[in-house]
Design a protein with these regions (language model features):
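Asp-box/WD-like beta-propeller blade repeats and closely related beta-sheet repeat scaffolds
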Residues: 28-33, 57-104
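Loop/turn-rich, solvent-exposed surfaces of beta-rich toroidal or solenoidal domains
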Residues: 163, 167-243
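Structural signature of eukaryotic scaffold interfaces centered on beta-propeller domains
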Residues: 1, 31-45, 49-50, 54, ...
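N-terminal carbohydrate-binding/catalytic regions of secreted carbohydrate-active enzymes
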Residues: 1-32
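Beta-propeller blade signature
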Residues: 4-16, 59-76, 117-147, 209-226, ...
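Secondary-structure boundary elements
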Residues: 39-44, 71-80, 101-107, 127-133
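Short glycine/acidic-enriched loop and turn motifs that connect beta-strands
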Residues: 1-4, 42, 52-59, 114-118, ...
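Beta-propeller fold detector
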Residues: 18-27, 77-91, 130-176, 225-243
Length: 256
């Protein structure tokens, strides 16, 4: 859950139980487009998510420069904009960095964007975790509508020093019926040797509710399409959702 500045990371103890009783608050980390939960071998739970975000004119934090691996501690609050282990992609000014992990295959995917193009970088997860810490800087804007630039010096891991297993880019399309990435980016996933790219309408309210369009395209690590762009259902079954009391409400705007 997010209000543009704060991410509420909640964990339900079991079916039908209130997740709000097991919640951690992260402030100024970013949009929270992609969040990964890790049940680690040390018995702890870690949350992977975007970090080091800037505030825009609407007061919402996004366009982040890194991802962080944060230990999940119920009741804790972090307001530094990053925490735990932080990873910078550090490639050609690419920002809006979003994480996906296949723990079984030990694959780490970082998605990013720049100048209307989406980029996808795949790493060996264990090699990324073993990168040495080094001092890195991130300049972000905070305060009222981005009025205060802040430069942070952070002990972090530089993914630019990590072996790249695969990488490719996807330019924005214009034909919504046919072009990959002609709708807003809504998420991505790495699974084995493949990357799943999810695009679709931002959340709509009012007359446009439940008229969502959404598509998934599957790529290999070199960017070749192995499963063509396929339409999928996303908040489109109005009749099926209504009995479950799932109704439209205002949401933060989507990132493109």
């Amino acid at each position: 859950d997010s209000d543009g500045t704060t991410l509420n990371i909640c964990r339900a103890a079991g079916p039908g139980l209130n997740a709000q009783s097991d919640c951690m608050i992260l402030k100024y980390f970013g949009h929270g487009t992609q969040i990964v939960a890790e049940e680690a071998s040390d018995g702890k739970t870690y949350i992977w998510l975007n970090s080091n975000a800037s505030v825009d004119k609407s007061g919402e934090y996004g366009d982040n420069w890194s991802v962080s691996r944060v230990e999940f501690v119920p009741g804790a609050t972090s307001d530094a904009g990053y925490a735990g282990e932080t990873f910078f992609l550090n490639k050609d000014g690419q920002y809006d960095q979003q994480v996906s992990i296949d723990f079984g295959a030990r694959r780490l995917l970082i998605g990013s964007r720049r100048s209307g193009v989406r980029y996808f970088w795949i790493f060996d997860l264990d090699e990324a975790l073993a990168l040495p810490l080094k001092k890195m800087t991130a300049t972000v804007t905070v305060g009222s509508a981005g009025s205060e630039p802040v430069t942070r010096e952070i002990e972090a891991r530089d993914l630019n020093d990590c072996r790249v297993l695969g990488g490719f880019s996807v330019p924005a399309g214009s034909d919504k019926e046919n072009d990959v990435y002609s709708y807003s980016h809504q998420g991505h996933e790495v699974a084995g040797n493949y990357v799943y790219f999810y695009e679709g309408n931002a959340v709509e309210t009012g007359a446009d509710s439940f008229e969502s369009k959404a598509y998934v395209t599957v790529f290999n690590y070199s960017g070749k399409i192995v499963v063509p762009r396929t339409e999928v259902a996303a908040v489109a079954d109005k009749a099926g959702l209504a009995p479950r009391d799932l109704r439209p409400r205002a949401m933060p705007r989507a990132r493109v």
